[in-house]
Structure formats: C-alpha cells, structure tokens
Regions:
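Hydrophobic helical h-region of N-terminal Sec-dependent signal peptides
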Residues: 6-12
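Extracellular LysM carbohydrate-binding repeats and other cell-envelope/extracellular binding modules
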Residues: 196, 201-232
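Flexible, processing/modification-adjacent segments and terminal tails
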Residues: 19-33, 37-43, 51, 59, ...
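A short, surface-exposed beta-strand/turn
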Residues: 68-71, 92-95, 189, 233-248
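Primarily a LysM-type cell-wall glycan-binding module
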Residues: 175-202, 224
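Acidic, serine/threonine-rich low-complexity disordered tracts
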Residues: 164-167, 218, 230-238, 242-288
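Hydrophobic/aromatic beta-strand elements that line small-molecule binding cavities or substrate pockets
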Residues: 35, 63-68, 89-90, 157-162, ...
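Generic short beta-strand segments
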Residues: 48-54, 173-178, 253
Length: 288
C-alpha cells in the first residue's frame, strides 16, 4: 500500500467524537437559504477583509485588504495593513491576458503581470484571485452542506443570535466527515489538475497531503496517489448578517480540529454600482 493510500486509511479510521445524529436544524437551513438568495442578488460589493490563513503549522499574521468586486469576476485588492501593506492587485477575465496586475507598494515598486495560479501569486494565499469572492464563499458553503445532507452525513446546527462587528447576526455551524479518494497524478499534471477534476480546492488537497512535504501545486510527481478530501472542512462556523443575509465571518477547521482559515468581512456594502474605472489601473486613486 502506498503512502497516500495508507494515510487515507488512517484518516478514515481515526477516532472521532462519539457518533451524533445527522442533525440539520430548520433554522440553520433557512439561514442558508436566505444567504443563497442574497448572494444570487449581489452584482457587486465592497468590504474590508481581515484574513488569517494557515502557513505550515501556524496561522499567518492578520492581513487587512480592501476589496471591490463585480460580476463575473472583476476584482480590486488593496492591502492596507499586514505583511504586504500597500500592495494593490487588479484582475478581470479576459483583461491583461488573464494575468494579475500587481505592484507591491514598497520600494522598489513597479508593476508586474503575474500568473494568478503560479507559485509567486499563491505564496501568501490559499485561493487564487480568479476564485476569490464572497459569492464563491457562499457557493462553497452551500455545496458542502447540500452534499453532506444528501448523503445523510455531517451536521448543520443553529447556534443562536449574536452581535458581531456591531451587526446582528445568526451563527450556524456545520460538520462533515473525513471521507475522500486518492486519484493518481498523471504525467504533466499538477495539483491544479486534480483540483479541477475533483472540484476540490487546491489548498485543501495540499493541506491533506502536508505530511508528504508538498507545499506547492507542482511538487508531487507523476504516479503519486493524492489524497483528495470529499468536503472542504471538518467543521465550519459561520456568522450571517441578519440584514444583508451574507457572511460577515467564517472560521474553517480541518478534521484534526486545526483552524486553517479565518475571514472577517467588515463594512460590507452590496450593489454599489461600480464603473469600469474601479477596475482600471489608470484610476488616479490607485498607485499602479
């Protein structure tokens, strides 16, 4: 048995908390249904994101990023506090040969055109810029909960009403089992190909195989069996704004209980009515 297959067997056989009923609270399902409708009606939004993501075995320092987003995937990112303070990023499908326009905001500062899926662009982010948005986050949560519910596994619980960032919110929690599969990497493939074929996040696949010393999509070799988790997280905690019906915070944990993603959404405003200037590097408010 190869290493990946053995690891998956161990993962599936690992002791867990005592078995609980596959509980899906009506209040939580209603909150997710309202969230789905709100996301479908979101044409653009602005917010201040605070994120912390797992790097190796430690959470990276907090990053504060101002975001403008517009369908289908126009996006402007400006890091206002954190390790890359001053950095600005622009991306739009079909523009700039589908590359990021980036400048780091510190000396020596110059514009770069960057592959959004390349190791440099992915060095400090779990998610490639073409796949970053609040709407995609909602889709990810809904997809995982629906698939678990359909298989009568996992849980979705209503945890009550709270106040977060001065906003009334509903808190829900979801769990999913540590199931998965082990496809074999073919010649010329990377983990991006496995991610595309399976519909799983490349980061989640990379994290599941961390014991093998892989820290980039191109590290595994042809013939390697790759652990691909069926679900994005072992546990997620979601705070949904009671007025906007969109997430204002989410915490995602792996199946060993480690927090690997924490996202806060501050000053969220939807359907702003952005113009092409908001995604133009020539905008005088930007420093490209």
């Amino acid at each position: 048995m190869n290493l990946a297959a053995l690891a998956l067997v161990v993962l599936l056989a690992a002791p867990s908390a005592p078995s609980a009923p596959h509980r899906y609270d009506v209040e939580a399902l209603d909150a997710l249904d309202a969230m789905a409708k709100a996301a479908a009606g979101t044409n653009d939004y602005a917010m201040r994101l605070i994120k912390r993501e797992l790097r190796d075995t430690e959470l990276a320092p907090p990053e504060t990023i101002v975001i403008k987003w517009q369908r289908p995937q126009r996006i402007y990112l400006h890091e206002t506090d954190g390790p890359r303070q001053g950095q600005e990023v622009l991306y739009a499908p079909g523009w700039n040969k589908n590359k990021l326009r980036v400048h780091k905001g510190s000396f020596p500062d110059f514009n770069l055109n960057m592959d959004p899926y390349g190791p440099t662009a992915m060095a400090h982010s779990h998610h490639p810029v073409p796949e970053i948005s609040l709407v995609r986050l909602v889709d990810l949560v809904l997809d995982n909960v629906k698939r678990a519910h359909a298989k009568n596994v996992g849980t979705l619980t209503f945890e009550g009403r709270e106040t977060l960032f001065g906003r009334p919110v509903t808190r829900v929690e979801a769990t999913a089992p540590p199931t998965g599969k082990t496809p074999t990497l073919e010649k010329g493939q990377t983990l991006w190909d496995i991610a595309k074929a399976t519909g799983q996040s490349m980061y989640v696949i990379l994290h599941a195989n961390r014991h093998r010393g892989w820290w980039q999509a191109g590290h595994p070799k042809s013939g390697d069996a790759v652990i691909v988790p069926e679900f994005y997280a072992g546990r997620l905690v979601l705070w949904i704004d009671d007025e906007l019906h969109l997430p204002v915070q989410i915490d995602l944990y792996d199946h060993e209980g480690a927090l690997y993603e924490h996202y806060e959404h501050h000053e969220l405003v939807v359907n702003v009515g952005f113009t092409p200037d908001d995604f133009d590097p020539k905008n005088p408010k930007y420093k490209f």
